């Protein structure tokens, strides 16, 4: 329940807490059709390598052992498609996203890849998932949790829907930790990325928000503490590309 006057950040702006989700939805409605292309352009294709590390860490069964993945904020299906290709006959993924435009792109791509029998798409909110307790073997969220207004609620929901012995994986932008790289990274982020967004999608403002939202996301050790508060054990993280991204991991034991 939102308290009157309660605020949160939308990029560098303070906004009423109950308005952030609408603002985030507007961002992804605007960019859905070019979202994956923009990921390639913004990261120089590196996001593919980061996601491959996530799937390798997930390590889904390659035989017919049943394995249910919940891919939250999975929109266009990229993580689920990668997981499906790395899995055996028992794999099934549910992509849960609050944005209908992103989901529609994902459904179309699942059909194109002949993966619509292994990956389904449902509209839902990370803060109040519609799934039963202890119903999934793994939970993934890639470059999505920083857009959730109440991250603590999303983490508690992730814990709730996971079976005991199952893993939570979160791939998210982080804090550059290589001397000299941070200034170049800031220049690219604040000057180049919004301009790429303007040229490719006609929307520089959405990418300005995305850059700002990265800077507002908690440091890895703070996010690990939030995971522990939600109940996760063995919370840790793996930094990649000089700190540009981190893969966060935790277990429901």
Curated annotation (Swiss-Prot):
UniProtKB keywords: Menaquinone biosynthesis, Methyltransferase, S-adenosyl-L-methionine, Transferase, Ubiquinone biosynthesis
Residues that hold S-adenosyl-L-methionine according to the record: 76, 97, 125-126
Gene3D superfamilies: Vaccinia Virus protein VP39
Catalytic activity, EC: 2.1.1.163, 2.1.1.201
Pathway per the UniProt entry: Quinol/quinone metabolism; menaquinone biosynthesis; menaquinol from 1,4-dihydroxy-2-naphthoate: step 2/2; Cofactor biosynthesis; ubiquinone biosynthesis
Reactions this protein catalyses: a 2-demethylmenaquinol + S-adenosyl-L-methionine = a menaquinol + S-adenosyl-L-homocysteine + H(+); a 2-methoxy-6-(all-trans-polyprenyl)benzene-1,4-diol + S-adenosyl-L-methionine = a 5-methoxy-2-methyl-3-(all-trans-polyprenyl)benzene-1,4-diol + S-adenosyl-L-homocysteine + H(+)
Acetylation in keyword set: no
GO MF term list: 2-methoxy-6-polyprenyl-1,4-benzoquinol methyltransferase activity; demethylmenaquinone methyltransferase activity
Keyword Cytoplasm set for record: no
One Gene Ontology biological process: menaquinone biosynthetic process
Stated family: Belongs to the class I-like SAM-binding methyltransferase superfamily. MenG/UbiE family.
Role description: Methyltransferase required for the conversion of demethylmenaquinol (DMKH2) to menaquinol (MKH2) and the conversion of 2-polyprenyl-6-methoxy-1,4-benzoquinol (DDMQH2) to 2-polyprenyl-3-methyl-6-methoxy-1,4-benzoquinol (DMQH2).
The protein's name: Ubiquinone/menaquinone biosynthesis C-methyltransferase UbiE
Organism field: Rhodopseudomonas palustris (strain TIE-1)
Lineage, uppermost ranks: Bacteria, Pseudomonadati, Pseudomonadota, Alphaproteobacteria, Hyphomicrobiales
């Amino acid at each position: 329940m939102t308290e009157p006057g309660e605020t949160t950040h939308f990029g560098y702006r303070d906004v009423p807490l109950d308005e952030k989700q609408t603002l985030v939805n507007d961002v992804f409605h605007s960019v859905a059709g070019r979202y994956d292309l923009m990921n390639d352009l913004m990261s120089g294709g590196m996001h593919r390598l980061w996601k491959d590390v996530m799937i390798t860490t997930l390590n889904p069964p390659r035989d017919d052992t049943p394995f249910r993945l919940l891919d939250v904020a999975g929109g266009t299906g990229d993580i689920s498609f990668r997981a499906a290709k790395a899995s055996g006959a028992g794999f099934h993924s549910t992509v849960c996203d609050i944005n209908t435009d992103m989901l529609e792109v994902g459904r179309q791509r699942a059909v194109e890849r002949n993966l619509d029998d292994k990956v389904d798409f449902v509209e839902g909110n990370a803060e109040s998932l519609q799934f039963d307790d202890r119903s999934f073997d793994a939970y993934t969220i890639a470059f999505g949790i920083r857009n959730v207004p109440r991250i603590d609620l999303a983490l508690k929901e992730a814990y709730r829907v996971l079976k005991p012995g199952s893993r939570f994986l979160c791939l998210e932008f982080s804090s550059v930790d290589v001397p000299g790289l941070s200034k170049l990274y800031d220049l690219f982020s604040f000057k180049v990325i919004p301009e790429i967004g303007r040229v490719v999608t006609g929307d520089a403002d959405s990418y300005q928000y995305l850059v700002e939202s990265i800077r507002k996301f908690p440091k890895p050790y703070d996010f690990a503490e939030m995971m522990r508060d939600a109940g996760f054990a063995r919370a840790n993280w793996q930094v990649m590309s000089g700190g540009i991204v981190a893969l966060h991991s935790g277990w429901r034991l």
